[in-house]
From Swiss-Prot:
It comes from the Eukaryota. Signal peptide: none annotated. Zn(2+) 3 binds at residues 175, 178, 198, 204. This is E3 ubiquitin-protein ligase Midline-1. Keywords: Coiled coil, Cytoplasm, Cytoskeleton, Metal-binding, Microtubule, Phosphoprotein, Repeat, Transferase, Ubl conjugation pathway, Zinc, Zinc-finger. Zn(2+) 2 binds at residues 134, 137, 150, 159. It comes from Mus musculus. It is an enzyme of class 2 (transferase). It catalyses: S-ubiquitinyl-[E2 ubiquitin-conjugating enzyme]-L-cysteine + [acceptor protein]-L-lysine = [E2 ubiquitin-conjugating enzyme]-L-cysteine + N(6)-ubiquitinyl-[acceptor protein]-L-lysine. Ubiquitously expressed in fetus and adult. At 9 dpc-10.5 dpc, highest expression found in frontonasal processes, branchial arches and CNS. From 12.5 dpc to 16.5 dpc, high levels found in rostral part of CNS. At 14.5 dpc, begins to be highly expressed in kidney and lung. At 16.5 dpc, highly expressed in the mucosa of the hindgut and cutaneous region of the stomach. One of its GO terms (cellular component) is cytoplasmic microtubule.
Length: 680
């Protein structure tokens, strides 16, 4: 029915055709709508009859009128009959086409309103309040007027009654440019409600327009979407507001707790000060009592001495008045002895008296405590500690890290973190990261590669089980209740694996000495027992180290001590003991035979040209990467590098035909070799 209704709807008024005219272009138009089009083309005070043409609103075909005007056009009787039958077939009531159109127009306005609605049919003054609004009549009625105008008979039984709404809601919006026309379409170009005349003859005729229902659905969907987002945002804001309010409450509670804690701590300090005041005051009082008691005794002694002296002085003066020599001599000797004794006793008494006792032993100096009290403040995270690389020590598998802290008294514990150094990039990354230690991609894969030693109480720690000849990054975190801060990273490295020469492997014509660090040619050496590991054979004057290396990076040096015929290298355990090193696939060697220098492996020699007076050879073994490199240890000049997929543990091996060689092992890898291995 709705599809048929749309075919029977006038393109101007959007209602069912009323007295339709059949245009020459085969389209139809309501007579009144056609008349309004002519009126819109008239100038001021110009009669409608003067207009003799207009455009079809559907196809834009120009319709030329005769002298009779619109009356000269034929009536579309067939269309009118179809409309009449359609109206009869449609039950008049809420489901009728006209009512359906009105309902769609009123749906947005049927919400309850606080505006008071008066009866529009009342003769009373003032009018009574309306109880119903008839959508069909577009009028609001009071109870009496409703009964009078809408008896329970046809056709009034088909009228739709709703709760009273204002008249403006019933009649809908009117066009701003054509006051007698309702808006019935939407100009998309100007984003404005318009009427049919605006589209036909107004400034919107070339604009894109849309049906109100279409625009209504689109804008409603958009509004619903925006409303959903707004509601969601409001929900988030309400959640945030609740959290903020909760945070405010927590701030109040925590601040009150901290204030109470501050009062408690200050009361404890005051109590401690009062206790110390009482203790020190008691000591001062006790010292005063002791000193006064001693002084009182000294006063009594002085008085007693004075009394005896006064009596003695009186007797002496009386004796001096005696003129009889015999009597004077009889008493003078005794008095003289007593005077001498009294003088001596007073001399002994005087040094005991201290007239300048100022209680120096009870001197008070609270300057340090005053400074501490002046610095009283809430606890903060300790300052970052500093790693003292100059104090750190290392062996081939341990590193002892030392650090200092400015806030040593506020630090509860330290946390040591370390990992293998893989490049400068992960140092920068660690330094920029406050507490989380993660290396750059491809350098330090994850936080799992960092080892953590927690709860350290001292300012030093020894890490065991490290790889030899390897550089590590260390950082120290100082921790207390307020937080933690990490030190700048420090780079420390373990030494190479130390080893010595194995005398059991030395050729019979070689002597190992100097704590198994030197090997020399010795034709007069004593007989040595045969052993499977001993070098033998004509000219195979070799000796092996006492270690087999199967991982890591290691560096050692060989002092040639004036020898001009020797070989320095490495060999598998399976390498033949009767061949020169480098003559087989199981050994690699740098060789010198007087003025001829070469490197040798699997019987193949490659000449090299080192400095004429090479006195110290450096050997760098990187087992995991399969490289054996030789250097001039004094000038750091690279001589040669073997690249091999090492499949077995290798042993340092040495051959000497004249003079001696001395090894220096357990060295850290030099810095210029530690970053990148030199290539030939």
């Amino acid at each position: 029915m709705e599809t048929l209704e749309s075919e029977l709807t006038c393109p101007i008024c959007l209602e069912l055709f009323e007295d339709p005219l059949l245009l020459p272009c085969a389209h139809s138009l309501c007579f009144n709508c056609a008349h309004r089009i002519l009126v819109s083309h008239c100038a001021t005070n110009e009669p409608v009859e003067s207009i003799n043409a207009f455009q079809c609103p559907t196809c834009r075909h120009v319709i030329t009128l005769s002298q009779r005007g619109l009356d000269g056009l034929k009536r579309n009787v067939t269309l009118q009959n179809i409309i009449d039958r359609f109206q009869k077939a449609s039950v008049s009531g809420p489901n009728s086409p006209s009512e359906t159109r009105r309902e769609r127009a009123f749906d947005a306005n049927t919400m309850s309103s606080a505006e008071k609605v008066l009866c529009q049919f009342c003769d009373q003054d003032p009018a009574q309040d309306a109880v119903k609004t008839c959508v069909t009549c577009e009028v609001s009625y009071c109870d009496e007027c409703l009964k009078a105008t809408h008896p329970n008979k046809k056709p009034f039984t088909g009228h739709r009654l709703i709760e009273p709404i204002p008249d403006s809601h019933i009649r809908g919006l009117m066009c701003l440019e054509h006051e007698d026309e309702k808006v019935n379409m939407y100009c998309v170009t100007d984003d404005q409600l318009i009427c049919a005349l605006c589209k036909l003859v107004g400034r919107h005729r070339d604009h894109q327009v849309a049906a109100l229902s279409e625009r209504y659905d689109k804008l409603k969907q958009n509004l619903e979407s925006n409303l959903t987002n707004l509601i969601k945002r409001n929900t988030e804001l309400e959640t945030l507001l609740a959290k903020l309010i909760q945070t405010c409450q927590h701030v109040e509670v925590n601040a009150s707790r901290q204030e109470a804690k501050l009062t408690e701590e200050c009361d404890l300090l005051i109590e401690i000060i009062q206790q110390r005041r009482q203790i020190i005051g008691t000591k001062i009082k006790e010292g005063k009592v002791i000193r006064l008691r001693k002084l009182a005794q000294q006063i009594a002694n002085c008085k007693q001495c004075l009394e005896r002296s006064a009596s003695l002085i009186s007797q002496a003066e009386h004796s001096l008045k005696e003129n009889d020599h015999a009597r004077f001599l009889q008493t003078a000797k005794n008095i003289t002895e007593r005077v001498s004794m009294a003088t001596a006793s007073s001399q002994v008494l005087i040094p005991e008296i201290n007239l300048n006792d100022t209680f120096d032993t009870f001197a008070l100096d609270f300057s340090r405590e005053k400074k501490l009290l002046e610095c009283l403040d809430y606890l903060t995270a300790p300052n970052p500690p500093a790693i003292r690389e100059e104090l750190c020590t290392a062996s081939y598998d341990t590193i002892t890290v030392h650090w200092t802290s400015e806030d040593e008294f506020s630090v509860v514990s330290y946390e040591l973190q370390y990992t293998i150094f893989t490049g400068q990039a992960n140092v920068v990354n660690v330094a920029c990261d406050g507490t989380c230690l993660l290396g750059s991609a491809g350098l330090c894969n994850s936080a799992d590669s960092w080892m953590i030693v927690p709860n350290i109480k001292q300012n030093h720690y020894t890490v065991h089980g490290l790889q030899s000849g390897t550089k590590y990054i260390f950082t120290v975190k100082a921790i207390n209740q307020a937080g933690s801060r990490s030190s700048e990273p420090g780079k420390l490295k373990t030494n190479s694996q130390p080893f010595r020469l194995d005398p059991k492997s030395a050729h019979r014509k070689l002597k190992v000495s100097h704590d198994n660090l030197t090997v020399e040619r010795d034709e007069s050496s004593s007989k040595k027992s045969h052993a499977p590991e001993r070098f033998a054979g004509q000219g195979s004057y070799g000796v092996a180290g006492n270690v087999f290396i199967d991982s890591g990076r290691h560096y050692w040096e060989v002092v040639t001590s004036g020898s001009t015929w020797y070989a320095i290298g490495l060999a598998y355990r399976s390498a033949p003991k009767h061949e020169w090193i480098g003559k087989n696939a199981a050994s690699w060697a740098l060789c010198r035979c007087h003025n001829h220098w070469a490197v040798r492996h699997d019987g193949k020699e490659t000449p090299i040209a080192p400095a004429p007076h090479l006195r110290r050879v450096g050997v760098l073994l990187d087992y995991d990467n399969g490289s054996i490199a030789f250097y001039d240890a004094l000038s750091s000049v690279h001589l040669h590098t073997f690249h091999a997929a090492l499949a077995q543990p290798v042993c340092p091996t040495f051959t000497v035909w004249n003079k001696c060689l001395t090894i220096v092992t357990g060295l850290p890898i030099p810095d210029h070799l530690d970053c990148t291995e030199q290539r030939p």
